[in-house]
């Protein structure tokens, strides 16, 4: 459990300790799956300490959830900080570091459903500008991507949907060909969007 601590500084320190404890530099290759805050921590770690054996990264990208820290701080600042600590404030205004070097193969999993908190904060999220779902615009250097009918909370538990595509990307450098490369709906805030049944 590297993420998240009470602040981004504490979280970065936890990641350094994790990397040292497990001697990441000794592996032939390091492949990572990064969620939103995790991408910030990995990028800052690589920028400061380097990780030349990092070969592949799959990013969870959410056009709605990536606006959550700022949206919460705009509307519920005291509640947000009380619930999640100073890390929420940190994430709402931090300068995002550059991604790893071009030799690192990047894949994207793009969420197409807003969480319940982001449905409450829809007006704040939309006020920040258009929501971009074209994966080649989200990350022009990404090798491949696919879209999911999941929200950010589901991304932590729906490995029945995520597991095989991630393993396929790590083995072949691309996601399975039958996965959707285009956005799945016009309104990610629509709570009536169908949720996939659990695959057992």
Task: Pin down the residues of each PLM region.
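Serine-dependent carboxylesterase/thioesterase catalytic core
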Residues: 5-103
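C-terminal catalytic-base region of ester-bond hydrolases, centering on the histidine
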Residues: 101-200
